[in-house]
Design a protein with these regions (language model features):
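Short, amphipathic alpha-helical "recognition" segments used to contact nucleic acids or chromatin
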Residues: 1-15
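Short alpha-helical "recognition helix" segments of helix-turn-helix
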Residues: 19-22
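Short, solvent-exposed alpha-helical "recognition" segments
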Residues: 29-51
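Active-site-proximal loop/helix segment associated with metal-binding centers of metalloenzymes
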Residues: 163-201, 254
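Conserved beta-sheet core of the metallophosphoesterase superfamily
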Residues: 200-294
Length: 303
């Protein structure tokens, strides 16, 4: 161990500078210089070695928080997963909540074969979705809530264009009207547009590739920048750094059931994404719901 290291250790132990200087055979000025240096350094002993780190300050900062939910597919939602997500929303108090498409399933107007055992009327789907939106507004009375159009929200419109084009342009048959979005102060965003939050572009998405993270990489290659997408029911985060900085790509997961009748053992994960912004710094956290349980910072949410 070097002489300076021994002096630092004695200082850390609380010995007086004069006695340390006398025992070490150095000037008191040298000991005082080392003591001043220790005020602005973090020194961790590692046997014969030392590591010096910059001083750190922890300060609470005002922040903006967005939470993104997608692919709930009401009425085929997982009741426990959705209950846990709403409970977390109540505690997290986001400034922005994005319902990022496929919130309602619209199965009766879909082009795929229907399972008679799962058949439910379109009005029942809309009624249950309206009840969910009312619950969100009650839970987050001051939060900005935005609903982006997914491919399932497009089903009714496409059905009308195919089967009853004369009715397709009727405002009362728009999803905004059918779901009472204005009443619940929820802003509607078309699928051709996106929600902006800090550096992020949030949209339902359309690129589908196998494997976690590959779909969002495809979106980032097409559009660039940081993005959040739904659509594929997977949880994944990737980071790409180029000459413009570091960009985040987020696949948002789902809150629907994980055992649909039309596919076996899907590569899906239940959960949602939280983005915090403060002082130009980005924090992305994905919350994975497992069997109706969510663990965040030591708090276990169970439904």
């Amino acid at each position: 161990m070097t002489l300076d290291a021994r002096i630092r250790r004695e200082l850390a132990a609380g010995r007086g500078k004069k006695s340390i200087a006398r025992d070490a055979g150095v000037s008191e000025w040298r000991v005082r210089c080392l003591a001043r240096a220790m005020v602005t350094e973090v020194v961790l002993g590692r046997g014969e070695d030392e590591i010096r780190l910059s001083p750190v300050k922890a300060a609470r900062m005002p922040q903006d928080r967005a939470i993104v939910l997608s692919d709930i597919h009401i009425p085929h939602h997982d009741r426990r997963a959705l209950a846990v997500a709403v409970a977390y929303l109540r505690d997290a108090k986001p400034t922005l909540l994005v319902l990022n498409g496929d919130i309602v399933d619209e199965a009766p107007t879909g082009a795929y074969p229907k399972d008679p055992k799962e058949l439910i009327t379109l009005e029942d789907e809309f009624a249950e979705t309206r009840a969910f939106l009312a619950l969100l507004r009650k839970t987050l009375p001051k939060c900005e809530i935005v609903y982006t159009k997914g491919n399932h929200e497009d089903r009714l419109e496409r059905y009308l264009v195919r089967q009853a084009p004369e009715l397709a342009s009727m405002g009362r048959l728009s999803l905004c009207a059918l779901l009472d979005l204005e009443r619940h102060r929820i802003r509607w965003v078309e699928s051709s547009d996106h929600v902006a939050f800090g550096p992020f572009e949030i949209s339902h998405g359309e690129v589908v590739r196998k494997g976690g993270g590959n779909s969002i990489r495809g979106h980032m290659q097409k559009r660039g920048g940081s993005m959040v997408m739904g659509h594929i029911h997977r949880l994944a985060t990737v980071m790409v750094t180029d000459r413009f900085g570091t960009h985040y790509g987020v696949e948002n997961g789902c809150l629907c059931g994980l055992q649909p009748s039309y596919i076996k053992h899907p590569d899906w994960q239940q959960g949602f994404t939280q983005i915090d912004l403060a002082a130009g710094v980005v924090s992305v956290r994905q919350h994975h719901i497992q069997g109706g349980k969510l663990l965040v910072d030591g708090n276990l949410y169970t439904a």
